[in-house]
Structures are given as C-alpha cells and as structure tokens.
Amino acid sequence: MLKNIFHNCLSLLLFLSFLFSQASPEKRLDAKYYLVSYTKFKEGKKQEGMEIIQKYFWQADREINRKVLPFDFITGEWDHIVFFPLEDGTNELDWITSPVNAKLWKAMVKEIGSEDEVKRIRQQFDNCVMKSKQELAFTQY
C-alpha cells in the first residue's frame, strides 16, 4: 500500500515537472496564417455560386494580387474551401475591415461598376449558400 502511494506521488511529480517544463513561452517561427472559408451550397445552386466566385471574386483577388488557394471537394460535407492568406499574420484580425478587404472591395467596385451592384452580387451569392464557416490555420512549410 505504502509502495503504491509512493509510486503514485512519484508519477505525479514527474508529470508536473514535464508539464511545467513545457510552459515556457515559445513563438512560431516563419508561420504563415490563413483564414479558411468553407462553403456548402444549397441544392441546385452550386453552379451559380461557383460562377459568381469565378467571375467576380477570383477576378478581384487577381486584381489586388492576393494569392488565394481554392479547392473544390469531390466528397465530404463541403463544396468549396478557400485559404485566404493573412498578409499581416494574426494582426489582420484586429481590423473590422482590413486593408486587404478594403482593396478587394475597391477592385470589385471598379470591375463591376458600383457599390450597389457589388452588394447585389454579394446578396445573389449569399442566396446560393446553405451554410458556411471560417477557421484559422497556419503553416510553417
């Protein structure tokens, strides 16, 4: 019995020393951060939604030279996923409207012709979407 108590206390001390040895501050080096956007389209609306993405959203991203990484799924829950690079890392999340999003908006207005028309197209796209979510990711490669 005493041997078991000693063994358990020793195990706890070893675990705690390991836990605290890992508690020192450590920063990710050379991390590139992405906002990852997942989209599931309504039944029968995938083609329309993808046409809007290709015609307007991709064009605006090219105009501002933002290197997005889009993927279309063959299987699984989602239809479309895009990795949007956060040029200023996680600091970009501090903005209500980031400088990149402001440039994107201006590029879309320039391409489409007016803010009202951009809003209409955005609403048309939103009407194609059944659900969406966004997550943060990073890579150090």
Please place each PLM-identified region on the residue numbering:
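Bacterial N-terminal signal peptides that target proteins for export
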Residues: M1-L10
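Intrinsic structural disorder/low-complexity segments
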Residues: L10-S11, P25
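Hydrophobic h-region of N-terminal signal peptides that target proteins for export
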Residues: L13-Q22
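Short S/T/G/P-rich N-terminal loop/turn motif that feeds into the first structured element of a domain
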Residues: S21-Y141
